[in-house]
Amino acid sequence: MKGLIIVGSAKVGSHTNALAKYLVGQFDTHDLDVDIYDLAERPLNQLDFSGTTPSIDEIKTNIKDFQEKVMAADFLVLGTPNYHGSYSGILKNALDHINMDYVKMKPVGLIGNSGGIVSSEPLSHLRVIVRSLLGIAVPTQIATHDSDYSKLDDGTLYLDDDQFQLRAKLFVDQIVSFVNNSPYEHLK
C-alpha cells in the first residue's frame, strides 16, 4: 500500500512537516510505503518564504509529479498549519490541481498545527473539501501546538508529547484499517 502526506506549510522545516515525519515512522510499523510531499520544498505556486521564486517550468514539473503521486496513493494525509483560523492557501492551491478522480473513495487523514491558539477549525474545513472530492475523511485527526514539539541540537523539530504520540498511533491504525477493509474498493 502507498500513502502520501501532503504538507501545506510555506515554511521549510515546519511543525506540520515534523508531525508528518513522525507519522511516517508510525506507518512504517505497518510496512506501508508513505511519502511526504512538502509544498514548501516543492512549490506549486509563487508564495515562497525562502525568498526565491521558482521558475514556471519547475512549477509545471512539480504539479505533474504531485498529481502522479496523489493518483498512485491508496490513502492521503493532508497537513496544514493554522492560517487565520483555516487551512493554508498553499494547500488549497495544491488541491486545486486535482479533482475527484484523484481522491474518490480514498481514506484521507487530517493533521494540523497552530502556533497560537490550538484549533481544529482548519481540519473541519478540510473535511468539507475531502467530502467534495469524494474522499473518506477518517474520524481521528491530529491538531497540535508548537509547544508539543522539541528541537534537536541541529534545530530539527520532533513531536515530544506522549498524548499526541498515542493519538498519532490511533490515527495511523485507523487509516490502515480503512485502507485494508474498504467496502468501497469497487467504486474507485
UniProtKB/Swiss-Prot annotation:
GO molecular function term, any single one: oxidoreductase activity
Pfam family, any one: FMN_red
Cofactor(s) it depends on: FMN
Record EC number: 1.7.-.-
Keywords: Flavoprotein, FMN, NADP, Oxidoreductase
GO cellular component term, pick one: cytosol
Keyword Transport found: no
Family: Belongs to the azoreductase type 2 family.
Subunit structure comment from the entry: Homotetramer.
Function comment: Catalyzes the reductive cleavage of azo bond in aromatic azo compounds to the corresponding amines. Requires NADPH, but not NADH, as an electron donor for its activity.
Protein name: FMN-dependent NADPH-azoreductase
Species this chain originates from: Staphylococcus haemolyticus (strain JCSC1435)
